[in-house]
Structures are given as C-alpha cells and as structure tokens.
C-alpha cells in the first residue's frame, strides 16, 4: 500500500470520527483489505425534528495480507482513532470461491 493511500485512510478516519469498526480481508492475496465503520449521523426531518441514522462507511486499502507491517499500521490507526479494540467475533463468507474472514472490533 502506498504512503499516499495510507494518508487518505488516516484522513478519512479522522474526518468521520469513527466510533467502531471491523477489518476484513480475503484469504487470497492482493484483494482489498477493507475498513468498515459505522457511525451515527444526525439528520433533520421534513417536520423539523431531529433523527439519528446509522451510516456505514467502507474504506478500501489494497495490500498483500501477508504484509504484517501494513496490518499493524492499520490497526494502530484504528486504535489511535477509536480507542482500544478487542476482537468480539468472526464471520466467514464464501462467495464465488473466495473465503473472507471478517473480524468485528468493539471498543473495550
């Protein structure tokens, strides 16, 4: 992953003040490493009342999943932005022969 891409990710994380996130990657190399974040967004309804909705943002980071240096860096960014994260669960998705492991991170 290029340094420019990493800078964009850091900027995106800071801008969105992400509350929680999880990371996912494909078991095949060089497929997207994705940071998904869910944040609560305030909206004003037509009648003037305030409502809140959940918004999910996906930030794509391309790199070889065996590149542990980048993995550590992405996790460091998440920890710095969102506080400490613990893996709270995993889910396995099979789609067109690609097995994906999704790790859910919840604020400790």
Give the location of each predicted region.
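Long, highly charged amphipathic alpha-helices
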Residues: 8, 12, 69, 73-77
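Short coil/turn motifs at beta-sheet boundaries
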Residues: 29, 50-54, 96-98
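Glycine-rich loops and low-complexity Gly/Arg-rich segments
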Residues: 45-48, 59-63, 83-87
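Oligomerization/assembly interface segments of phage tail-like spikes and tubes
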Residues: 53-65, 99-108
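Short active-site-adjacent helix-start/loop capping segments
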Residues: 44, 68-69
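Small/polar-rich, solvent-exposed N-terminal microdomains that initiate assembly or binding
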Residues: 1-49
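Residues that cap or flank secondary-structure elements
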Residues: 1, 65-66
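Acidic-leaning, charged glycine-interspersed low-complexity segments
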Residues: 72-108
